[in-house]
């Protein structure tokens, strides 16, 4: 009798599911997993094609003509980085490249000229994706101490000092996540990069995420909710990554006030 009741109950559960034979928990887990994978793929490959946004093409065209007339050094003597990457503003190979918080790369002088030339009331919008640029990250080394490089550093610090502390929405923080995490971990494992207190905080965050994954105590236990119970693990790790990106942005802001 008990066996018959159990079979009837399982049939009722199958009838209540959206797809017959597949539980709703599995469907939710599959949908969320595909959404996370799609978001990750978009974040990784959205910067492959660096085409100027149609709304910025006229401004970039005028700026490009001005830069060509003011260019003192020939293209052959420009210091080049990322030989397979071209600056979409000047159409030359990246010279003293600077990366925006949205992950697009430009010549340092080009993005600064784009800021100075345009009539911006606040932070500029990215010439490619139109996302608000609140942070400029240098990709070139600190070896060159020429006057032009020192002036470029000063302009970049000036821009970051003005706009890096602007409030960010949760969606904007998610869009900035790949770029900020890449720079944060690169500095973490480089000599003279991040100070030790910040490195310790990153390590503690990663250890906390690891122990939460292996801990049997969960907000949504796998024993009760099955595969759906793994979603809270991904959510906690995702929040920790956002927290690391926020800390890294604060570190950059603190450097500017020294």
Curated annotation (Swiss-Prot):
A Pfam family the protein falls into? DUF1232
Question: For side Lumenal, which residue ranges?
Answer: 1-24, 223
Q: Which InterPro entries match?
A: DUF1232 (IPR010652), RNF170 (IPR038896), Znf-RING_euk (IPR027370), Znf_RING (IPR001841), Znf_RING/FYVE/PHD (IPR013083), Znf_RING_CS (IPR017907)
Q: Which reaction does it catalyse?
A: S-ubiquitinyl-[E2 ubiquitin-conjugating enzyme]-L-cysteine + [acceptor protein]-L-lysine = [E2 ubiquitin-conjugating enzyme]-L-cysteine + N(6)-ubiquitinyl-[acceptor protein]-L-lysine
What is its pathway? Protein modification; protein ubiquitination
Q: Does the keyword Disulfide bond apply?
A: no
Give, as residue ranges, the zinc fingers classified RING-type: 87-130
The tissues where this chain's protein is expressed are given as: Expressed in the spinal cord.
Q: Which SUPFAM superfamilies match?
A: RING/U-box
> What is the recorded membrane topology of this protein?
Multi-pass membrane protein
- SMART domains, from UniProt? RING
- Role noted for this protein: E3 ubiquitin-protein ligase that plays an essential role in stimulus-induced inositol 1,4,5-trisphosphate receptor type 1 (ITPR1) ubiquitination and degradation via the endoplasmic reticulum-associated degradation (ERAD) pathway. Also involved in ITPR1 turnover in resting cells. Selectively inhibits the TLR3-triggered innate immune response by promoting the 'Lys-48'-linked polyubiquitination and degradation of TLR3.
Disease entry from the Swiss-Prot or TrEMBL record: Ataxia, sensory, 1, autosomal dominant: A rare disease characterized by progressive ataxia caused by degeneration of the posterior columns of the spinal cord. Affected individuals have a reduced ability to feel pain, temperature and vibration, particularly in the hands and feet. Their most prominent feature is an ataxic gait resulting from a severe loss of proprioception. Thus, patients rely on visual cues for maintaining proper body posture, such that they are unable to remain upright if their eyes are closed (Romberg sign). Spastic paraplegia 85, autosomal recessive: A form of spastic paraplegia, a neurodegenerative disorder characterized by a slow, gradual, progressive weakness and spasticity of the lower limbs. Rate of progression and the severity of symptoms are quite variable. Initial symptoms may include difficulty with balance, weakness and stiffness in the legs, muscle spasms, and dragging the toes when walking. In some forms of the disorder, bladder symptoms (such as incontinence) may appear, or the weakness and stiffness may spread to other parts of the body.
Q: How does it assemble?
A: (Microbial infection) Interacts with human cytomegalovirus protein NEC2/UL50; this interaction promotes of UBA7 ubiquitination and subsequent proteasomal degradation. Constitutively associated with the ERLIN1/ERLIN 2 complex. Interacts with activated ITPR1.
Q: What name goes with this protein?
A: E3 ubiquitin-protein ligase RNF170
Gene name for this UniProt entry: RNF170
